[in-house]
Amino acid sequence: METLNFQFPAAEPGRGRTLVGCVSSGDLEVLIEPGTAGSLQIQVITSVNGSAARWAQLFQRLFEGRAWPAVNIDIHDFGATPGVVRLRLEQGFEEIAHD
């Protein structure tokens, strides 16, 4: 198990909370909650040791250069592929946009 933390610039706090996905073989769950203005915080708890560079690259592609709401994201990973991670994050942001 490994715990990773990331931070990116953000706009105003998001409005809602959501939980998408579930932790099981090859998947992950993503919890998104309102955060502090100006900061998007991510904590990843993963079963895959030594994966920090992969997570950092994925988040840089997703979060740099766009105005995202200020949220706290908790990810519990059980070996999900980058495509599944992106899908779950997009689902989560879509959910909080409707709150």
Curated annotation (Swiss-Prot):
The modification O-(phosphoribosyl dephospho-coenzyme A)serine is found at S25. Covalently binds the prosthetic group of malonate decarboxylase. InterPro entries: Mal_deCO2ase/Cit_lyase_ACP, Malonate_deCO2ase_dsu. It comes from the Bacteria. One of its GO terms (cellular component) is cytoplasm. The keyword ATP-binding does not apply. It is found in: Cytoplasm. Keywords: Cytoplasm, Phosphoprotein. Transmembrane segments: none annotated. One of its GO terms (molecular function) is acyl carrier activity. Belongs to the MdcC family. Subunit of malonate decarboxylase, it is an acyl carrier protein to which acetyl and malonyl thioester residues are bound via a 2'-(5''-phosphoribosyl)-3'-dephospho-CoA prosthetic group and turn over during the catalytic mechanism. HAMAP family: Malonate_deCO2ase_dsu (MF_00710). NCBIfam families: malonate_delta, PRK01220.1. This is Malonate decarboxylase acyl carrier protein. It comes from Pseudomonas putida.
